[in-house]
């Protein structure tokens, strides 16, 4: 009797897990894209899109600068601002920032150029010092969620 009950419970559990997996596979994620006004809404040569919106969350690809100066940092954050505005968002909607730089000391020194865009409402942030970015001459890249 115990064996029959165990087999029945096992069968029901397997059936439930199988159906849950099938349902998850049929659940299409609706994505909206924006890529600098590009008609395809993506860069097919590099294989990325600047902004992907899933439900009410924006995933913003990195914007880069060739120099870690107040001017370079400002250009990066202006590009990110344009990316956010493509879906009606601002820096006050940003919850996570990932910053990659080949010159961390300069980034720390000129951080005020970055902070002005957040207007005192800062996101969770991770800053990483790296030896190189995708664009060989880039020294700063910032991505947002």
Q: PLM features: what roles do these ranges have?
A:
Residues 5-7, 20-95, 101-145:
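N-terminal presequence-like segments and the immediate start of the first folded domain
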